[in-house]
């Protein structure tokens, strides 16, 4: 078996396509009207078509379940956070720095699915190293193997 991607049920597919392309920078690679697939393996399907395929009614859906998230990484994290603010995206709390040093921000898409965007790990490693952490300190802080960290710092 091979995992192929995530499909989100959405109320307004046009609004979702606009969000995922403009806010997250994904590209639509397939558009079948009631279903669209983006780069990165994310797809959206209209609620109406999903109900037709599964024989479920509208009471089946529970948006903003807050129990799963899509995760992305961004090389220019600060600029991305500025873009979220400009677009009026609904944040979940504030951006934060995780205990291992990675900056993250969480927010909702138009159907209240959670999106998390983290600072690219190689960018994080270079930032922490520039702030004075040694490779051994990075191993301790991030729980990553020394060889991986060294490759990230060289890349």
What do these predicted regions represent?
Residues 12-27:
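Amphipathic alpha-helical segments
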Residues 1-15, 68-70, 120-155:
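N-terminal beta-strand motif that seeds the catalytic metal site of vicinal oxygen chelate
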Residues 25-30, 91-94:
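Short secondary-structure junctions
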Residues 27-64, 114-119:
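Conserved short beta-strand elements that form part of the metal-binding/catalytic scaffold
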Residues 13, 65-114, 131, 141-147, ...:
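Vicinal oxygen chelate
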């Amino acid at each position: 078996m091979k995992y192929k991607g995530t499909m989100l049920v959405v109320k307004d597919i046009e609004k979702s396509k606009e969000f995922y392309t403009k806010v997250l920078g994904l590209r639509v690679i397939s558009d079948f009207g009631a279903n669209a697939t983006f780069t990165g393996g994310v797809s959206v399907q209209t609620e109406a078509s999903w109900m037709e395929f599964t024989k479920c009614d509208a009471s089946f859906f529970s948006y903003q379940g807050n129990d799963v998230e899509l995760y992305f990484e961004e090389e220019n994290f600060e600029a991305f956070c500025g873009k979220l603010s400009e677009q009026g995206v609904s944040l979940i709390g504030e951006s934060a720095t995780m205990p291992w040093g990675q900056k993250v921000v969480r927010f909702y898409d138009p159907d209240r699915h959670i999106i998390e965007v983290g600072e690219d790990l190689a960018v994080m490693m270079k930032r922490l190293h520039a702030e004075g952490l040694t490779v051994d300190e990075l191993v301790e802080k991030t729980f990553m193997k020394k060889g991986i960290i060294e490759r990230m710092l060289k890349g």
